[in-house]
Amino acid sequence: MATFGEALEALEEFRAELVNLQMNATVPQAQAMAFRATAGQAGDTPLANVHATGVGIRDDGQFVVKVYMFDAASVQSAASVSLFSAPMQGVNVDVEHLPVQVAFDRGTARKAAAAAAGNPAQHQARRRPVPGGVEIGPLGGNFVGTLGCFVRRGGDDNGPLFVLSNNHVLANVNRFPAGTPFTQPFSASAADTIATLSSFEPILFPAPGSQPRNVIDAAIAVVTDPAQVVTGRMLNIKKYTPQLMAPRPGMTVTKAGRTTGVTNGMIRAIRVRGVQVNYGTRQNPIIATFDNAITITGNGGLPFSNPGDSGSVILDKASGRPVALLFAGDGSTTTACDVSVACARFNVHPV
């Protein structure tokens, strides 16, 4: 059985061979790596449908190279490509269906019945003092997300307190200016304001001659009145330890989110390169590509997240330490970014 390190080495070799195959295939590489919005897939062959790869884990604890395809039908025909059917440096290769992910920023509580055990109503209510894992939205706006956790600047325990969440929650996908007020819960009343937008990492989208990659969907907002919030706490999570931790395939995780409340799941893969995320609508998709992503599935066949849970900080369940920042999904798989990378971007640490 391969070790985690061996799986990482095999992943890099696999990616190199995949690029060579795609360049030499009859389907042009540009088409193979692009999302064809009208069809919901990149092409008509297994090679053309690969859009992401990472290192993951099977239920038996075996580390594997993960290959993600747009089209479920192509997963069935993947065995026709030797690269997908044979081990890479002794590490098995698993091919799975992963559709285009959707940025989870709208507050429609879909599948609420399935998530009722997570007490979602408590996470949508007004809370004072405000903990992590609750509803947040722009003052008088038309969407909501989740307040992930509170953070401070590195080494400054007496400095300003910030909210950590997603760009598409706090900055409305690069649109909001600094100083935009946010309320808890979503409200049209300025009296419910708890923070104002401070900074965000821009989300990059394709343009003629440019195919940029993203690694985080993250932003911070400065807390307006620290007396109105409580640090070191996630609503309905018993163990929260505000110390960053590296994610790992097979890790049991938990999160508190605005729509599904507290849910539990498992990290299926990390260092996933090439995940396609839709920041538009189904009819008018606006696709951004993410590298170094993390994929998670919920326990017991339940969704780990739903729209409105974006911005949730995902914790290692055993230690309560933050490992990821939730930002997208498809109803079955949740996609997150490494929260350590997000914190480093803003020079902050959880508190």
Located regions from the model:
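A short acidic/small-residue loop/turn micro-motif
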Residues: D330-G331
